[in-house]
Amino acid sequence: MAKPTRKRRVKKNIESGVAHIHATFNNTIVMITDVHGNALAWSSAGALGFKGSRKSTPFAAQMAAEAAAKSAQEHGLKTVEVTVKGPGSGRESAIRALAAAGLEVTAIRDVTPVPHNGARPPKRRRV
């Protein structure tokens, strides 16, 4: 039987994009898109091998942002606008890691959804 032809990853040439950082209490997901929202690269703390409570650390968020930035720079990305969503601990370190990886951060926008008193929040933890 003939070998299935592998689809080559097309190298897009995009100068500027948007870095979406989704920081939850359990994980941090960094997705880099073009200005229209088409994904160029993504990474998360869990995808890098962090498990359990280590996923929610600022260091894990930093590593996820670096990995996403590296693979986005292969497509020619140079500048990003950053949108941050969620209350997680990896918000600041992910933004710093994007800048340290060589991407120029032009704007930082907080798009955390705030309920107008919607669903009941989880009960308080008693440790």
UniProtKB/Swiss-Prot annotation:
DNA damage found in the keyword field: no
Transmembrane parts of this sequence: none
GO biological process assignments: translation
GO cellular component: ribonucleoprotein complex; ribosome
Known role: Located on the platform of the 30S subunit, it bridges several disparate RNA helices of the 16S rRNA. Forms part of the Shine-Dalgarno cleft in the 70S ribosome.
Family membership: Belongs to the universal ribosomal protein uS11 family.
Extent of the signal sequence: none
Entry protein name: Small ribosomal subunit protein uS11
HAMAP family per the UniProt record, alphabetical: Ribosomal_uS11 (MF_01310)
Keywords recorded for this protein, A-Z: Ribonucleoprotein, Ribosomal protein, RNA-binding, rRNA-binding
Highest taxon of the lineage: Bacteria
InterPro entries linked to this entry: Ribosomal_uS11, Ribosomal_uS11_bac-type, Ribosomal_uS11_CS, Ribosomal_uS11_sf
Subunit organization: Part of the 30S ribosomal subunit. Interacts with proteins S7 and S18. Binds to IF-3.
One Gene Ontology term of the molecular function aspect: rRNA binding
Keyword Disulfide bond: no
